[in-house]
Amino acid sequence: VKTSVKTSVKDSITMTIQLNETHNPELRSWVASANQPDSDFPIQNLPFGVFRRHGSHQAFRIGVAIGDQILDLAAAHAIHAFAGYTELQGGHFTTAINAPYLNALMALGTPVWSALRLALSRVLRADAKHLAALQNCLLPQSAAEYALPAQIGDYTDFYTSLHHATAVGKLFRPDNPLLPNYKWVPIGYHGRASSIGVSGQQFRRPVAQTKPPTAETPVFGPAKRMDYELEIGIFIGQGNAPGDVISMDQAEAHVFGLCLLNDWSARDVQAWEYQPLGPFLAKNFATTISPWVVTLEALAPYRQAWQRNAADPQPLPYLDAPDLRDSGAFDIQLEVLLQTEKMRADGAAPQRLSTSNFRDSYWTVAQLVTHHTVNGCNLNPGDLLGSGTQSGPAPEEAGSLLELTEGGKKSIALSNGEQRLFLEDGDTVILRGWTQKQGLPRIGFGEVTGTLLPARS
């Protein structure tokens, strides 16, 4: 993966990431669990999150996942674990590393993120010095509770899966499933940031207007067609000033990292309200994200060339770039599992419903960032972009129940004898994501879980 770094008069940094010593697949950590081949968090990953000891009621702290542990960054900084790195000195870094959210660290930009990753890699390696002091900076993940990684000021959800858009379009417009703008412009809408929660979120079945097919007028009550959406979340790092455009060659330098995202949806509410402005109450009640943010630098060895079908319109010039063609896609395997209330009561494991891969996305991370700002819209550190439901080309790769059940016509038989068309009260949905390549370690995102509770009476 190529790297170019330059600074303009507006202090924007253009950067794609070079492989470096932190990507060495031979690296091992003194945290033994990080060396297990099935670990989501080997030393080559080092994702960021916000945590505290479960039940402590203390302030949240910034941490990095390593194996089944969390390294407390403020504690590590206090014992001078990051001494000797110019980018990691001074008041701005100290303030950022001691904050209860990642926003200030996100705002410091790629030179600081990369230097911090290098410093972390070196102090966590098997041959690192001062192990006794660093061991006191660890907390088992099993003893932690999490908050949102950042204070999310704005949330925009996109619609980047051609396969999802086509499948859903066929349900409502069989003769014209894909609207004419889809292959030209990344479709997005502004979502609700206040109801985004971290993994483990529980929320009540929303109540709203719907219009059943046989009814002459709408009715008010609990939504009946509850669904999940399998998505990738994109956290913005450094923002841009109002009026400035983030070009394609700058876009990924403004991305702090990726997470998993479940965009819960009430399909019957959505069907009634979405015209002409799109979903509102159908989606604003809850969105759940994973606690760990995986940096683009960690994902660098797992990039792929991005291709657009020759028969399709090619991106307009502002959405195209040589680096996009060379390595614009991310090979991230995604998975959805369901655990019903009965499964939990019986001690049964969750059942996998589908898998897909982010590499099949029609639009890339860089294109979303550039398109979002091309009219001068400013992004801020901690802003969140959703990829939209990630479905693959095969029916079993659908990222929502709406697709898997063909709009509620085809029931899913679960292994314990239960059936599902849409989610029922007590259902827990689990999303997982990881990337893996021959000769390289597994880089995981952990998981994001959420549980649907009954509507308020």
Q: How does the language model describe each region?
A:
Residues 1-13:
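Compositionally biased, intrinsically disordered low-complexity segments enriched
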Residues 21-53, 65, 72-355, 362-366:
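Active-site microenvironments in enzyme catalytic cores
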Residues 62, 69-70, 231, 384, ...:
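Residue-level marker of beta-strand positions
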Residues 154-161, 378, 383-387:
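Conserved phosphate/anionic-ligand binding catalytic regions in large, soluble enzymes, centered on
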Residues 362-371, 381, 385-434, 441-451:
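Active-site pocket scaffolds in enzymes
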